Curated annotation (Swiss-Prot):
UniProt-listed GO biological process terms: photosynthesis
Function comment: One of the components of the core complex of photosystem II (PSII). PSII is a light-driven water:plastoquinone oxidoreductase that uses light energy to abstract electrons from H(2)O, generating O(2) and a proton gradient subsequently used for ATP formation. It consists of a core antenna complex that captures photons, and an electron transfer chain that converts photonic excitation into a charge separation. This subunit is found at the monomer-monomer interface and is required for correct PSII assembly and/or dimerization.
Protein name per the record: Photosystem II reaction center protein L
Coarse class of the protein's main subcellular location: membrane
Key words of the record: Membrane, Photosynthesis, Photosystem II, Reaction center, Thylakoid, Transmembrane, Transmembrane helix
Subunit organization: PSII is composed of 1 copy each of membrane proteins PsbA, PsbB, PsbC, PsbD, PsbE, PsbF, PsbH, PsbI, PsbJ, PsbK, PsbL, PsbM, PsbT, PsbX, PsbY, PsbZ, Psb30/Ycf12, peripheral proteins PsbO, CyanoQ (PsbQ), PsbU, PsbV and a large number of cofactors. It forms dimeric complexes.
Entry's family note: Belongs to the PsbL family.
InterPro entries: PSII_PsbL (IPR003372), PSII_PsbL_sf (IPR037266)
Xref: Pfam families: PsbL
Cellular-component GO terms for this entry: photosystem II reaction center; plasma membrane-derived thylakoid membrane
TM regions (residue ranges): 20-40
Topological type in the membrane: Single-pass membrane protein
Length: 41
């Protein structure tokens, strides 16, 4: 039943997971940099 909604569990989940991870890391880095700059200012 878990294979019905996802027909291609070979490219979609992997790509989505990778994109999500990279986006999350980038967001955290940007937020940290902005916060640091704001505090330093």
């Amino acid at each position: 039943m878990a294979d019905q909604p996802e027909r291609n569990p070979n490219s979609q989940p992997v790509e989505l997971n990778r994109t999500s991870l990279y986006l999350g890391l980038l967001l955290v880095f940007v937020v940290g940099l902005l916060f640091s700059s704001y505090f330093l200012n």
